[in-house]
Amino acid sequence: IRYVTDTLAADVSMTDSVYWGSGWCWDDTPYSFQPYLSPLMLNRGCVDVSVSPAQKDSLPQVVCTPASDYYQVHNHGVSRNPQAGKLKITRNWLSNGNIITVSGNVSYPYTEKLNVYTSKDFFFHTFVSRLRSKELKREPARMPIVL
């Protein structure tokens, strides 16, 4: 894609009203085995959150894949300090949010896979963001986004 001359749109009309499979319930989120289903998926509707310890009592390194500004990361972890408590990687799923929070002790590298709320929006938002980062030419000056 070199440029967009009109509206960039994504059609998710192939989705029915049941975005969780039969037998699944609201409390199965934010786990990766139960992503929100959509015809548009990126990384199975999930984010891989990898943490690695740094120097004792400092913030651990957090890397999320795929990288996107669709979600936020709050790093409250502590490196190599058992008094910080058990490592916990989660998102604010009860409020249907996409704020990923790392807390507790990080004593060794670890990766957790979390689903994101509204995987179709995650796909399209990340797609458009990557187009813009590649300096996609927009004609006219604005590129409307419809989902």
What is each residue range found by the language model?
Residues 1-147:
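Conserved serine DD-peptidase/penicillin-binding transpeptidase domain
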